[in-house]
Structures are given as structure tokens and as C-alpha cells.
Amino acid sequence: MIFSQGVSPFKGDFSKIKFSIASPESILAHSRGEVLKPETINYRTFKPERDGLMCEKIFGPTKDWECYCGKYKRVRYKGIICDRCGVEVTMKSVRRERMGHISLAVPVVHTWFFRSVPSKIGALLDLSTKELERVIYYEVYVVINPGEPGEKQGIKKLDRLTEEQYFQIITEYEDNQDLDDNDPAKFVAKMGGEAIHTLLKGLELDTQAVDLRKILRESGSEQKRADALKRLKVVEAFRKSFEPVKKTRKKSTGLFPEDEAPEPYVYEGNKPEYMVMEVIPVIPPELRPLVPLEGGRFATSDLNDLYRRVIIRNNRLKKLIDIRAPEVILRNEKRMLQEAVDALFDNSRKANAVKTGESNRPLKSLSDALKGKQGRFRQNLLGKRVDYSGRSVIVVGPELKLHECGLPKSMAIELFQPFVIRRLVERGIAKSVKSAKKLIDKKDPIVWDVLEKVIDGRPVLLNRAPTLHRLGIQAFQPVLIEGKAIQIHPLVCTAFNADFDGDQMAVHVPLSQEAQLEATLLMLSSHNLILPQSGKPVTVPSQDMVLGMYYLTKSRLGEKGQGKLFYGTEEVMIAFNEERIGLHALVFVHYDGRIEQKFDPLRMLDIIPDDQPEQKEWLKTKIGENKILVTTVGRVLFNRYVPEKIGFINKVIDKKGAKDLISKLSSEVGNVATAEFLDNIKQVGFHFAMKGGLSIGLADAIIPEVKVQHIKKATKESTKIVREYNRGTLTENERYNQIVDVWQKVTNLVAEESYQKLRKDRSGFNPLFMMLDSGARGSREQVRQLTGMRGLIARPQKSMSGQPGEIIENPIISNLKEGLTVLEYFVSTHGARKGLSDTSLKTADAGYLTRRLHDVAQDVIVTEDDCGTTRGIHVERGIEEETGGQIKFSEKIRGRVASRDIVDNLNDVVILPAGGIITDEIADAIQKNAGVVEADIRSVLTCEAKQGICSKCYGTNLSVHKLVEIGEAVGVIAAQSIGEPGTQLTLRTFHQGGTAQGGIAETETKSSMDGQVEFESIRSVEQETINEDGMPETVTLVIQKNGKINILDPDSGKFLKRYEVPHGAHLVCKNGDIVKKDDVLFSSEPNSTQIIAEVEGEVKFVDIDKGVTYKEEVDPQTGYVQHVIINWRTKLRASETREPRILIVDKEGETLKTYPVPIKSNLFIENGKKVKIGDMLAKVPRNLDRVGGDITAGLPKVTELFEARIPSDPAIVSEIDGYVGFGPQRRSSKEIKVKNEFGEEKNYYVQVGKHVLANEGDEVTAGEPLTDGAVSPQDILRIQGPNAVQQYLVNEIQKVYQINAGVEINDKHLEVIVRQMLQKVRVEEPGDTELLPGDLIDRTMFIRANSDVSEKVRVTSKGDAPARIHEGQLYKTREIIKLNRELRRNSKQLIDVEPALQATSHPVLLGITSAALQTESVISAASFQETTKVLTDAAVAGKIDNLAGLKENVIVGKLIPAGTGLKKYLKLSLDMLAEGKESADALAEEEAGAAESGEDDA
């Protein structure tokens, strides 16, 4: 046997990796020898045993340049193979790469291919896993060739036989056994791996594929087709793995004549029999080490035990075969060998896994070494430990510049030691490396000077775990400091999410020139001022700095020097330094720059003393010229640091003001000036926080006096409610809700009172109020608990449905200043603990969400400038009303490219032509301009780039406000931008200590602009009612669903805005009215849905029976008796059914209209009463979420949307436009029919008790919900198509983040992820392509497959075509035209063809987990989840990984194809290197030539 001499398969550059099943030949080609003995090392000499699992002869020496027996030592014998012990003299590192093998006595089935779902071997042989198992584990025989005996006995190929049946046939037909094995008449049956090997070897895959496709086309049985499809997938995978490989032609050596030369191609691929192994590879010994411990014991890798079991059993079996042992014993030994090999490859799949002796845990097999967080992929390939790094505790460094960090000397000397040593040797301070090291150890003073020089201009990277987004690693210029803690700048804490309570950070040194350059240019902290997730600044002052700036810029009447007039800002500073004027004094300053007035100067003239009339007159004239500034001394001081271009900032600076100012600075004056400004205001902020001496004393928390009265009143009210409940006039639910409402109102009242009290205290200079108002620390919520009352406490519960018991109804009346009673304290501990436990549990969930997002989007990279699409998405101004002003129209379009002209409808002006970028200025202008009501913008969702996305569809890079560059890894940025706030989402209840905040729902809808009202499909009726004051009034009631109010421009009649009007709303405006901004259009009741009579007639109740379907309850306020529908199913026998409904009948008793009444409805009408149009028949209450801000609903909701899960109680959605009708009622469901004018009808069955939104005869549109409940994204995709579902997902996720958590994430990040969820299509009809029905493939691959077929035709009749043309086959159109020309010329019959059929498909919405597993890259999918399954499928299909994404390249150790790792940049640097080398060579040649000529002259 010849072994390849250790040729590494990865020598040189490679661009793709192919996966396939290893053939016995390839295993032997990689092996250096056979392992024959189970021994590892000799326990006396501690040397490896020869031919054992650690053998030096096979795997290489254990000591560098030394053979086993010691005959050859030293490097000079390199490459010699010792004649005594057979060991090659080489480095010991080869023990990490050299492999061995074990030759098995009988073939063994590879467990991956037989236990995978579906079983690969089972699919090929058409056997179930159970039957396969019985054959493999030597329980039954399988017939390989029935021969004559089989025919006579009616036995077919692949039949299973028991031992008795087998021996019966063998004895009955003894002569038959003498025939040759290849004789078709001979009866052959075998068991175990051998049988499977023989069967797989005899398979004809091409024939099998044709037969299976025939079944798919022609079979009527659904089950048969499903089975055929499952098998065809495996067969096709094997067939696809065969691909032509160029054969290297040997130069003619006379071995065979030229005409006998072989074909230039051979077909290489997976043969099915490779799934049964005859040879097992043994991995290198250093990858399964054996380490000696103290006390003469050894720690060993589990793999050694598993290999040992295989070798022992294999050797025993060989012996037994040699001595001709009985069949029973052999069979048992063979079965044990099969089990040993199974355990070696995958020990976790088996029920009876092999366990260790002592701790009884399953041994870690080869599969386990790849799987999971501790597996090879995630532990060693995706994350590695790095040298040149250190970590330490962090402390604040307030005197540092923004781009600096303080590095302890002791750390710096360790990190930069090699560079220091080199300097010391170069400068001759030390003679050798050794002496330089000694100098360093002695801490010689000269070393620090050298270190200073070494680190100058060399950035270091700081990282704080967990690194949730890219700002978790930033570069800084190190400054050497004494001490042992790293100092960091206070402004970068936000980005790192760091504080100084013991956090640690890691330091890394970029070594290469390129790495240093990238760190300085791209990663320096002063270049990362903007958050990539929202485009908002991240280096925002906080806490002390904010408080200092707020204190500095606040004004106070009556300060020293108030009302003085100064000629310029310098004069003000002189006066202040001379202490002639107070910091908060209002003064008049002559100023020539840009003025943004905050005070009305003429009104402020009163603060000038009356004895200076001429000053007042002079001021009046100057104010007219807008040259006089009314400001405070502090603001003048603050504005010294604001760049001139920005103008004078004349307002109190709080946290939000600071944030907006920094945002403005970064876009207008650039990073350098902004960084300088930040450093200045840091100094100013800290200085004035100190000067102001702002700290909280107990006296600063002021409790309002009115609190006592409010509480007395509330206690009275709640006692009254309880009394009514005891009388039986209130239900439990109503009592609870009313008490909660009473206390909620009181808590809010007291909170507002205490806030106002603080605001007025010391004319706004109460330290507690200043901290709150400036945004430095604390929230209104906390102040309420300190000085108002703690109020109601939420009871921790998972559900968010608003059921009773979510809020503990006894409030905490005390506040934290007064102190809590024992009971109150006990009640509040509950919520506080929940906050902490939630935090720790949810952080893991958020981390897992981030990981899945990363995996699904890691290969989305900007690959081209413009994909050329004309499509885009449509954005309307209505988004603001829907989200309560949280999401602005301008935010939706900012930084995008317009796909159509953006037009001002009022003035007919094009504000921005198609293809233009919507910059910040344009976006703000559009926001203010009411004429722009809609915009079409380019989006990632509609990008048509072949791979990755294009920069026009993505828009601007948020962190630099420029169009995104090619090579930007936008997928990873998107994943980080969504995942990082995900961990904040979780910490939401944390600070409020679990107190409940209930919202009082908004009932009025106001116009957001001036305009004229136009009604669209609104049917209304006027109704007499009694208002709150007891006076009669007429209201206009909307009695039609889907009504709309449009706002038009009064002059041109152009459409500006649309509002949806709910059923039962009260109209405040009339059609054609002119309305102003903030005028009320209509009001609606948010807590309930009303059922309103739409026709006149008499009421008739059906199935509304007292005690069965309704009960009587008394309304506490009015004393009216209410009839409430109850769940009747609990009251009746199983066979009985009821459907409570209200009919309206005419005089003849004919039914005019039917209204089903859902459970919990209140009836507002009596049986037999006459009703007019617009009368209320019943009210259906809605559940309101009472508990505010607990994000437990937030994260699971986001996960549900990203995973595209079907909601637990989904709404039933109409699939067509049409009119609603009802079918007969069943026991547990009722039928809704939707019929359109073309006679198409769809039927839906609804569970009884579910509220049906549609009434008989209502018109509905496709996609409209017919019942209540959440709409399933899968339904939206099916009915309204991919665009609708993409928009739905983006908007819904955005709502959770913005409204529940107040976190801003730009839409484009969500779009990148949602695009990935819709990348796949499912093939419906494959046509003439090679696809299979039901295949899930990438959209681009589907388009490619169809375009391939579009150039081909199918031959229907071959005429006189040459023999190579077959009927029914596909050929290129050009080829057939050419052949037909030839045939026509020779007057022969032409070839008849028809166009090839294209495949059809429908888009599929995948959750992010499925999408990540379905990625084109094998390596990426394998490192994500289900490693063994992914690798098995890839090996069978011979898949090729093109290394297109980031993850694959990290794993194989290449530069990532993004940023500076893009191919075009790499090529650039290689070209430059080549040029540099050429010019250096030329120079050297010149010099050599010159030297030679010099010698000649001499």
C-alpha cells in the first residue's frame, strides 16, 4: 500500500470547499498506516506503543527531530526514516495532522446516513428505518438476489427473512449454493453492513430517478407521490454530486498510444456504497490527547476509549473468522462491532450510549466534538483566544481626551514587550534579547522612555463583554498611567454600556501595519460618535455633565447684575470673572451672529431699573435691528465652546437638548470639531456640577399637602364600591376594575401635584427637580414614588390579557420618604424581585435572538452600486397617528433614495426627483410641508441585486450620513442594531420596582393638518342622546364599517391625508367642513365595540335565555340591570347547541338583519322592542392592557414576528373580495361564507364564542379579518403577497420597539432581516427544469433554473436526426436549428420540437431560525444549529460552499469578504505588492549592474 506523503489538502489559495462522502480509497490516501493494537502508551516507559493508537511510526515523533529509539537526534537528520523503529525524523507538530486508519473485518454502516431523518439508506433501498435497523444489527436476512429458489417460493428482492426461513431455503435447495455468486439463478441473502453494501453497490440511480419521476407524474395516490418525492430528493442529491473533473493527461510515455488516451473527463461523486464503511479513519493523536496527571494516572480524550473498543472488537472478530467460529458467535461479534463504530461516530443519538466508568456520563463522540457551543465550530473556529491582550478593571479618566484611554504601565510593558525589546536592541541599550528582557524585569527607568516612544501613534482596542454591537470594541490612543486599572473617557461609557462598579475590559494590540491603520481610521472612538442603529449620537453627556450644563444655562430672576447691558460676550465674561454679575442673571448682550431668541426682548425690558430711560430707548432700537440678545451669563459661557457656524444657543441645555446639539454638530461641522466640543462640555459640565454643589437632601423631597384629602376621598369611593359588591349589584370583575380605576386616578393626581410643587420650589432650583428636569437622573415615576404615593403594584404574571388579578387592588398609600408599613413593604417586595429575576432570564433570550439574527443576515453585504430596479415601498404620513406620534414620517424616509419624484401636492412642485437622496435637510423640510403626504422610496425589500444588496436600495450609512459604500456588512449591522436594544427591552420593569401604570385610552381623533373634510363610504344616522350635563343633544353616529375621512387641500382639492373611522364612532365634523390642525374629527369608544341597528324594525332574541346564555348584573353607577352574555357551553349537555343572536324583523316577521352576540356582551335592548337605525343593540367589551411597560410581552412578541410563527389565536381572514353570509350553526363552530360577484365562494369555520367582526351582507376585501385575534403573517403572504407581509412585519416589530420600549431602530435594519426571511421560494410545478416539486430554493437559483430552460426545446419527434438526439430530451434551440438546416438541405424529415416548460413557484416566509439553516453556505448552517444533519445532507449532495458570507470565511481562516477584505481591495494590495517587488528587483539589478561596471573599470 502506498501512502501519500502528507500532502495537505489546503496548500495554497482556495475559493470553494466541496463536501462529499469519503470513499475507502480517500481514507487510505490520507492515512499514514494502520492502527492494529488498542494500546495507547506503555505505562512503564510512558512511550507510545508500536501500531497502537498513539504510534510514532504512524503519526510522527513525540519529540522534535528525534526518533522513537533515539538513534537519530537533532535537526540535521530531517526527513530520514529510522531503520530500527520506522519513525520519520521531523517536528512533533505533525502529530496534529497525520491520520491513520483501521481496516474492518466486515463492512459497517455509517450511523449518520442511516439514522438521519429521512434515512438516506432507507430512501435509496425503499426500506423503513425499523426494517433497516433489523438488517444492520443482524436480526434478519435481506434478499439480495432471489434466484430460482426465490421465484419458486414467491420471494422478491429486498424481502426480509428470519433465520428459520433462510436455513429452510438453503437446506431445500442445497445444489443452488454451489453456483457462482454472480449467477442470476443463485439465491443470495445476507445480513448486516455487508448486505447493505452489496445492495447499495447494485443500485442504478438513473433508472431509479426516472421511475420515481414517473410515479410523481402519473400516480393518483397522494401517499405514493409523497413517498416517491421523499426518495427522489435523496436519489437526485446523489446524482447531482457527480460532476465532471478534468483528468490530468500524462505526457505520452509510450505506455499507451495516443488514440487510446482516456477521455479528458472522469465523473467523480458520491457512490451510495460509500455510506457503508470498510475502512475507518483515525484522527491525529494530538487532537485526542492523553495527558499524564500526578500520581501516575492519565487524563484521556473520550475518543481514545471509543477507538479502543472498535479495535478490540475488530481484532476479536478477525480472530474468530480465522478460527472459523460458529455463525451465532460471529454474528454477535459483528453486531458489537457495528455498535462500537456507531458510538465512535455519534454517541448521543443512541438510546444505550456508551458511558464512562466513574461518572457514568456518555462519552463524547466525533459528532459531539463538532456540535453545540463547546463544539469545534463555535468554540475553536468562530472564537479563538488571542495573544497580545490583557484585561483589567476600569475606572473613569475625566481628564482624558475622547480618543484616549489610560493604560497601566505594567500592562503596557507586557503588551508591547517585543517592540520594546526590539527598540532596546536597536538603540544599543541592550546587547541581546535576553539582556533586554532583564532590563524590563528590573523595571529600569530607560524602559519607560522607550515604551513611551513605542506606543506613540499605536492604537489599542478596548472591548467590554458582552459585545452586543460594533461600538463594543473601539480603538484608543493609550496614555501611560500609574496604578493597575484602565482609565476610560466618561463619554464612551454609553457605547460600551459600561459603569465603574467593578466592570472589566479587555485590551488588544493590533499588530500589522494594516490593522493599525484600520483601527485608527475606522475604529477610533472619536470617529464613532453616531449609533449605527438609528443615526443618533451615542457620545451624549449624562448624569453630572448634564446636571452641570443645565445648572449653567438656567436663568433666575433677581440675580446680581440682572438687566445690565454688555457690548459683547467678552465683556460679560470679564464682569463674571470680577464677580460683578451672577451666573444665572438675565442680561442684554450686543451680538452680531445668528440669533435664536428664547425670550421676548421687549417684554424683558421691565427688568431694567427705571432710572435708566435712555438705555431702554437705545435697547428698543437695537432690538428692532435684531442685534440684541437676552440671555444669561451661563449661556454666554457655554456658547464659547459652540462652533460659530451653529450660532448662539440661547436655551436651557438638558439631556435631550445636548443630544440634538451634538447631532446637529456632527452633520454640520464634522467629527473633529464635534469631538473637541464634547471634550469641552465634559469639562464644563463636571466643573459646574461641582460649583453648583447640587446634591439631594431629605428636605428636597416635598410632599404635597393635598395628598391626604385625595386619599380620604379615594378610600371613601372604594368603600362604596365594596358595599355595592356585597349587596350583589356589582360583579367581581366590575368591582375590581372600578377600584383599580379609582386608585389609578388618585395616584396620577398626587404625582402631578408633587411634580408641580417641586417645580415651584426655590424658583426651579430644587436639586431633586433639577436632576429630574435635566434628564441627569431619575424619572417622573421615581419622583412620584418618593414624594407622592407608590400607588398600585403589579402582581407578576406572564399573561398580558388584562385579566383580573394583574394589579393588586390595595394601593401603597405611603411614599418612600414617609416610609412604608410592614404590609406595604411586603407587597412591594414582590414586584421588585420579579424585576431582578426577569432581567437575568430574559438577557439569555435576547442574546439568542441576536445570534439567530446574525446567522440569518451575516451574508448580506453591499455588492453593487445600483441594481437598477424601479420598484420601492410606499410611505404615507398616516404613520404618526397610528403610533401616537412615536414614529415620524420624516424618520421613515430620511437617508433613503427616492424611487419616484416626491411632489408637494399643494403647490405642484417636485421637491426631489427620483434617484435623489433624502438628506436630513430634505427630510425635515418634507416633515414641515403638509403638501407632501406620501413618498415612494427605494428599499432593501425590493432590491434586485443577484447577490447581497445594492447601495441605492439601502440608502445612507447611518453612522456617517453618506450613501453606503460597497463592501459594507449591512446584514451584521442590522442584526446588531436589533439585537442590542433587545437586551434593553428585557430590563424594562427593572427600575420601576414593578409599580403599575395604567393608560387612559385616547378617544378623540384630531386632524394633523389644515384642510377640507371629505367623507368616503360613511353611512351615518342622527340620534338623540342625553349629554353629561343631563341635556338632550343630537349626535351623528357612523353605522358602516370601513368608513374613511379624507383631508383635502381647500384650494386645489388635492388629497392630503386619510383617517379610518370605526363603526359606532360619533362624527364631530360634517362633509365639506374646513378644519384646522388639531380640530376633532370624530370620537370613538376604545374600550368596547358596539353592535348598532342598521335597519328599522322589531327586535327578536334567538337563543338568549336567562341563566343559560345570559345573566343579570346591576350597573353600580346607574342602578340599571344589565344582561351579560355568558359562556353557555358549561351549562348544556354535549349534544345541545346555542347561538345567541339578535334579529331585526319587519311587520310580517321577515328577518331583515341578524347580529350574532359574542360572550361577555352587554345587551342594551329588550326583546320585542322597536328600534330605529343607529340604536345600540349591544356592546362588546375589549381587554385593555392595564400593566404598562413590562416588556415580557415585548421580547416574545419580537421573537414571534421574526420566527413568523402563527399566533396562538389567529384571526380568520377573507381570501377574496366579496359579501359576507352565514351558514348553519354546528355544535362547536359556525360557518362564514364570502361570495363575490363572479360566483366564487370561500367558507370558513369559526369556533363558537369567538367574536365575528363581519355582519351578514357586509362587504369585505381580501386580507380583511372576519373575526377578532391577531392576523397570521402566513395569511398575509398567501392573500396579499410578499410586499404586504414585509411591510406588516417591519411595522409590527417597529411598534414593539418604539412604543413599548422607546428604542429607535431605523427601518432599514428590520428590512434587511425581513428580506432574508423571504429569500426562498417553494417549487410548485418543476416543468422541464431539474427542480423537484416542493423544493425550497433560493429565489435567484429559481430564476436561473428557468432562464436555463428558456433557451432549450424538447424534441417531440426526432425525424431523421442523428442517433445522439432522443425524443423527450431537452436540447439547446441553436443546436436544433442548425441540425434542421442540415436536414432540410438533404431533403430529410425535420426534428419536431416544443418549447421547454418553465417551473412555477410561490414565495415562502421562513422564520429566522429556518432561514439561517436554509442558507446556501454549508459551513455557516453547520455552525449555527443541527450540525450533523446539515453536514450529512451536504455530504450526500456533494454541496460546494462558495465562501460568500462572513461566517464561512472566519471558520476557514480567510479574510472576510466585506470592508477592506473585499476581493477588489485584496487584488489592489496584491497588485501594489507585485509592482513594489518589480521595482525593487529592477533597482537591485541596476545596482548590481553598476557595481559590475565599477569593477570592470577598476
From Swiss-Prot:
Q: Which family, according to the similarity comment?
A: Belongs to the RNA polymerase beta' chain family.
HAMAP family membership: RNApol_bact_RpoC
Role of this protein: DNA-dependent RNA polymerase catalyzes the transcription of DNA into RNA using the four ribonucleoside triphosphates as substrates.
An example of a Gene Ontology BP annotation on this entry? DNA-templated transcription
Task: Report the PANTHER family cross-referenced here.
Answer: DNA-DIRECTED RNA POLYMERASE, DNA-DIRECTED RNA POLYMERASE SUBUNIT BETA
Query: What is this protein identified as?
Result: DNA-directed RNA polymerase subunit beta'
SMART domains xref list: RPOLA_N
| Gene Ontology terms: cellular component | DNA-directed RNA polymerase complex
Which InterPro entries does its entry note? DNA-dir_RpoC_beta_prime, DNA-dir_RpoC_beta_prime_bact, RNA_pol_asu, RNA_pol_N, RNA_pol_Rpb1_1, RNA_pol_Rpb1_3, RNA_pol_Rpb1_3_sf, RNA_pol_Rpb1_4
